[in-house]
Amino acid sequence: LDAFETVYGERALVDYDFSKASLIVSVGADFLGDWQGGGYDSSYAKGRIPRAGKMSRHFQLEANMTLSGAAADKRLPMSTANQKQALVHIYNIVTGSSVAVSLEDKFNAEVTKVAQQLKAAGSKGVLVSGIQDKNAQLLVIAINQVLASEAFSTSGVRQIRKGSNAKVTQLITDMKAGSVHTLIMSGVNPVYTLADSASFVEGLKKVKTSVAFSLKEDETALVSTIAAAVPHYLESWNDVSI
């Protein structure tokens, strides 16, 4: 979101049409799962049907096994730290840049090969990444721009979320400083979903009134001063707004 907003001025997510790609390189993105809201399996499947002896090829660089990794022609297991360095290495080869990179030697040959094939694919190549880091996503955008990737769409963007990690971090800082008097939470469970939930809980304890609207006593509701029950969809008849 941050990277797309920086480049295109809109807080949204890039959409992809994998049926237009002859080479797909994924760095930590399970695009056959629920990545960016899911729904990419259909266009991916179209490109995987052999036509005239050819079909799309798929390289997956990831830490844990995913649906996308299982479907890939080549899967290269690596840590998130190495994935970031792999992105830089691919960027250097595709764009002809010389950004400093510290990729482990055991990955260098394979990543170089992938990058060279991606560059050769040109507009028929596409790179995606699930790394939650602005700089990493800026590299992804830059690589696809240089490739002029047909599968990379900035017109039909996905507006499924607009959250900001920076704003959440600032909220936690303000809570810890005692600057937040009342916090109302609805449809979220930050104590469970945030990577550094301990800091959130620490800050929440300094908020005088915290209200969690929830269907059940989840992790956030249990540590809030007020846990307010909300009706489920069979009870609300779509006439309740919170």
Enumerate the predicted regions with their spans.
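Cofactor-pocket helix-loop regions in the catalytic cores of large enzyme subunits
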Residues: 1-242
